């Protein structure tokens, strides 16, 4: 049964010379034109609605190629067909007929005739399967990707048909050429193969082939109303139109071709009926069953393989489409801006569809809001339309239509309820006849509606964007976690092959420095083990710059690292960590601790000098770093750059670091000879570095200076530190003897050279002590209280002074402040800021008001910073006093070497006396060892 698109089909076929396209709007004005021109015009008219001119140009080119191929095939089929019935029938009418045509095959026993017919039947079956696949997927026909899937299915099956035709016609070169020419056009459009098959079958005289034609026509009609489903409007849902335009235009072109093929098939039916009446011989009765079975097996195998691939592609695409629809349903919303006139039109359309079970498709009007505040116009997504064509709906399409009707009814009810909300007085205004007021109220309604729905849409859109961003961030985090886990697994596997080591881990809230003597105080010289727990801020730096000489052990309860530092002859200026007094076990935990000394946030805490100093020293000691860059430390520890520079300036003045310029520094350590030199020289100096007045903290120095004892000791050496930690001097001599004097643990051993003309290996030499103790003035007295020692005129002493100038700091305000504050700390008493204020200003009366004014001066504030740096390094202990002033007390702790007793016992006058005694002993030994002269 044929389901046609045009009523009175037989009258149209017999009487009308022009062929009407199912999408054509032309009637009688096309009578004088040819069929091809009419179809081409109708095809182009269905494309011109598109806003994109690029698409129309593409379609015109495609159309010209199709119809050129169509005309050539139409002519060639009359001359190259294997069935002689067609040639006998069109003998008089066909100008291309030639009895001597090489393509004409008049062999009654030719087996290829049946092969071709069988192939045509198989092609029809394949096309029927394609149409079934197309109909099965019609539920997704409104989606953009389904048309593409169906086109792929048809193209794949058409390619199978091409292969089958080529395999079946290998016996005859002429037939092979004809089949290749006929089937090469199959790839142009999806339904071109139907046309070729129908022409073959129509030229035969068998009833079975006529029935196949009817089946093909039915399938073509099914394709037409399924293609028409693409034009059903989506109730105002805003969508992208580009893909729909392309797919709809392809479907329109297919429908036009199918219509034209249908006309030709109907004409061929009549010709076949005439052939039967004239009793022409039928060559199709000579069947070759062996070839048929072989071809059938080949077709089935190819179809099975291709169908499996096609089904997999369809399933994947359908899953993607479902995901897209699920996301779009959350964002896309039916637009409510429909006027009353448009509502009535939609209601009439729904009633007409319910009564007639036909769907009349019209081009949707461009909906725009009439209010002045509306800034956007809303376009319906359906750019393509049909006019005055009635298409029968399938059951699944009827279900979709009912769902659309329900959505429209809900939309109308929502609009009616929203229009009545808050405007109950509108009827009264209508009764009064105030048209101006009505228009104003309507405008206000529309403005409020637009604002309401725009706000809702924005909320939905923002929420969807947030969800998308959250999903992306979660995916990125998951990927990063997976990568980290993989890296950790690789690292763990590599570590299992080597020694059992573990990286240091510590909570983010603790910044702690633990010195090696807390675990191994018995062996401070040979080796020292340090247990350091790192922080979160320095974990990255410690992992990247961990020393190869450190080995770590892991336990089940806590994870710590024990670093073993061995004193070797190749290392110089190695870190020698201090030995604290029994009452001080230094641990700097200052964040998220109840007893901590900082209660601010971590961000503010990292701007404080004490916190930054603790992080810096911890990083340097735990990672065994000697040379570093300030910018690199800033990025690793995430601290303030300017605070870090202030700390390093104080440490440079204290001889704890050395500046190598360009923000490069060298960490010298707490027991380096430069720091010991600096501490001894400041403690035994006889002046105040701030006021330049006479000031003595060493009793022996004060007594000897008052008695007029001249200090002539040129060289001062320290052997308490391991010799490997000292850099050797340039000059050497074989005439060196040493005498050591061992004291208690708090004191150190000193090595004195036997004469001033000899310098000692592995020692740091100092300038003349008189020069240092005079505050760097180069000798002479400054202020009252004892005469200053003069510089020795010996040349070797002068060379030692020149070599010692590298240890002399440049006198600046900060250096003088650091020197004087350190001198006060080494005086072995609890120092307060009150004492510092009046020590720096001795001429001011010691009152509370003066103390408050002096406390806010720049130098005293710098003393606060110096005290915080020394406290973080564990050189000073800070505590609050109980007095009314509530000032802070500072107690000097020092290092394992530099203590108050060490400073007192290493007075330069005492060293000078020991030096003189040693010289006298050497002279006596030399006199005794000399041989007696002969008499």
From Swiss-Prot:
Region (Disordered): 1-32, 74-228, 265-287, 342-376, 394-414, 466-491, 516-559, 727-755, 778-799
Ranges of Low complexity composition bias in the record: 74-227, 275-287, 397-414, 522-559
Regions of compositional bias (Polar residues) in chain numbering: 367-376
SUPFAM superfamilies assigned: Winged helix' DNA-binding domain
Compositional bias per record (Basic and acidic residues), positions renumbered to this chain: 265-274
Positions with biased composition (Gly residues): 778-791
GO biological process, one term: regulation of DNA-templated transcription
Cellular component terms per the entry's GO annotation: transcription regulator complex
Signal peptide: none
Keyword terms: Coiled coil
InterPro entries on file: E2F_WHTH_DNA-bd_dom, Mucin_signaling_protection, WH-like_DNA-bd_sf, WH_DNA-bd_sf
Superkingdom assignment: Eukaryota
Coiled coil region boundaries: 262-331
Protein name in UniProt: Putative uncharacterized protein DDB_G0282499
Species in which this protein is naturally found: Dictyostelium discoideum (Social amoeba)
């Amino acid at each position: 049964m044929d389901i046609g698109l045009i009523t009175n089909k037989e009258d149209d076929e017999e009487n009308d010379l022009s062929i009407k396209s199912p999408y054509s709007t032309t009637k009688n004005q096309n009578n004088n034109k040819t069929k091809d021109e009419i179809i081409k015009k109708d095809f182009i008219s269905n494309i011109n609605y598109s806003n994109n001119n690029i698409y129309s140009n593409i379609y015109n080119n495609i159309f010209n190629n199709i119809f050129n191929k169509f005309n050539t095939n139409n002519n060639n089929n009359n001359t190259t067909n294997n069935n002689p019935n067609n040639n006998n029938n069109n003998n008089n009418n066909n100008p291309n007929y030639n009895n001597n045509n090489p393509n004409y095959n008049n062999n009654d026993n030719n087996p290829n005739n049946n092969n071709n017919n069988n192939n045509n039947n198989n092609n029809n079956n394949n096309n029927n399967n394609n149409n079934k696949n197309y109909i099965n997927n019609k539920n997704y026909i409104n989606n953009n990707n389904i048309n593409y899937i169906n086109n792929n299915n048809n193209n794949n099956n058409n390619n199978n048909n091409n292969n089958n035709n080529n395999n079946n016609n290998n016996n005859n070169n002429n037939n092979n050429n004809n089949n290749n020419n006929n089937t090469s056009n199959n790839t142009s459009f999806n339904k071109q193969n139907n046309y070729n098959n129908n022409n073959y079958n129509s030229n035969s005289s068998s009833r079975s082939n006529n029935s196949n034609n009817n089946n093909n026509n039915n399938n073509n009609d099914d394709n037409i109303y399924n293609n028409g489903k693409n034009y059903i409007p989506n109730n105002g849902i805003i969508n992208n139109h580009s893909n729909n335009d392309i797919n709809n235009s392809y479907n329109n072109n297919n429908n036009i071709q199918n219509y034209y093929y249908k006309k030709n098939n109907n004409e061929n039916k009549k010709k076949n009926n005439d052939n039967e009446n004239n009793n022409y011989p039928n060559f199709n009765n000579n069947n070759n069953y062996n070839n048929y079975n072989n071809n059938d097996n080949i077709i089935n195998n190819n179809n099975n393989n291709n169908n499996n691939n096609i089904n997999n592609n369809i399933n994947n695409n359908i899953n993607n489409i479902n995901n897209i629809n699920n996301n779009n349903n959350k964002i896309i919303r039916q637009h409510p801006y429909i006027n009353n006139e448009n509502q009535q039109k939609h209601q009439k359309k729904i009633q007409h569809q319910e009564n007639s079970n036909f769907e009349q498709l019209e081009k949707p009007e461009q909906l725009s809001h009439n209010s002045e505040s509306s800034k956007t116009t809303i376009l319906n997504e359906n750019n393509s339309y049909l006019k005055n064509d009635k298409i029968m709906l399938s059951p699944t399409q009827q279900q979709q239509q009912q769902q659309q009707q329900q959505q429209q009814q809900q939309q109308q009810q929502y609009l009616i309820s929203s229009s009545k909300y808050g405007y109950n007085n509108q009827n009264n205004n209508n009764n009064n006849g105030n048209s101006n007021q009505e228009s104003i109220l309507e405008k206000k309604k529309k403005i409020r509606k637009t604002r309401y729905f725009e706000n809702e849409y924005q909320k939905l859109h923002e929420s969807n964007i947030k969800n998308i961003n959250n999903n992306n961030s979660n995916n990125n985090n998951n990927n990063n976690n997976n990568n980290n886990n993989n890296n950790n697994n690789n690292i763990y596997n590599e570590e299992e092959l080597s020694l059992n080591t573990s990286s240091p881990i510590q909570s983010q809230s603790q910044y702690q420095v633990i010195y090696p003597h807390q675990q191994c105080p018995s062996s401070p010289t040979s080796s020292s083990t340090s247990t350091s727990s790192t922080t979160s801020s320095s974990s990255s730096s410690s992992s990247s710059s961990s020393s190869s000489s450190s080995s770590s052990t892991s336990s089940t309860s806590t994870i710590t690292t024990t670093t073993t530092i061995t004193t070797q002859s190749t290392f110089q200026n190695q870190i020698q960590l201090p030995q604290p007094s029994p009452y001080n076990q230094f641990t700097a935990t200052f964040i998220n601790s109840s007893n901590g000394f900082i209660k601010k946030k971590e961000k503010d805490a990292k701007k404080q000098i004490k916190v930054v100093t603790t992080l810096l020293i911890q990083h340097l000691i735990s990672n065994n770093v000697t040379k570093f860059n300030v910018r690199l430390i800033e990025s690793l520890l995430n601290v303030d750059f300017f605070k870090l520079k202030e700390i390093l300036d104080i440490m440079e003045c204290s001889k704890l670091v050395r500046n190598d310029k360009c923000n490069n520094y060298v960490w010298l350590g707490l027991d380096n000879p430069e720091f010991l030199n600096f501490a001894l020289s400041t403690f035994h100096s006889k002046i105040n570095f701030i006021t330049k007045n006479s000031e003595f903290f060493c009793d022996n120095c004060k007594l000897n200076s008052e008695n007029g004892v001249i200090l002539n000791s040129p060289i001062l050496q320290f052997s308490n530190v391991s010799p490997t930690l000292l850099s050797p001097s340039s000059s050497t001599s074989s005439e060196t003897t040493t005498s050591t004097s061992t004291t208690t643990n708090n004191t150190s051993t000193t090595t004195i050279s036997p004469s001033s003309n000899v310098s000692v290996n592995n020692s740091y030499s100092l300038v003349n002590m008189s020069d240092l103790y005079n505050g760097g003035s180069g000798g002479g007295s400054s202020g009252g209280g004892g005469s200053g020692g003069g510089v020795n005129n010996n040349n070797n002493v002068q060379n030692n002074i020149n070599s010692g100038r590298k240890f002399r700091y440049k006198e600046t305000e900060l250096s003088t402040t650091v020197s004087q504050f350190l001198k006060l700390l080494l005086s072995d008493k609890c120092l307060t800021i009150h004492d510092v204020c009046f020590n720096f200003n001795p001429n001011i009366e010691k009152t509370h008001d003066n103390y408050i004014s002096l406390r806010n001066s720049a130098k005293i504030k710098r003393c606060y910073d110096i005290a915080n740096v020394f406290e973080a390094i564990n050189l000073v202990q800070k505590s609050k006093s109980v007095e009314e002033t509530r000032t802070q007390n500072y107690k000097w702790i020092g290092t394992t070497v530099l203590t108050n007793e060490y400073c007192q016992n290493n007075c330069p006058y005492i060293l000078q006396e020991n030096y003189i005694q040693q010289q006298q002993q050497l002279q006596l030994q030399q006199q005794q060892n000399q041989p007696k002269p002969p008499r």
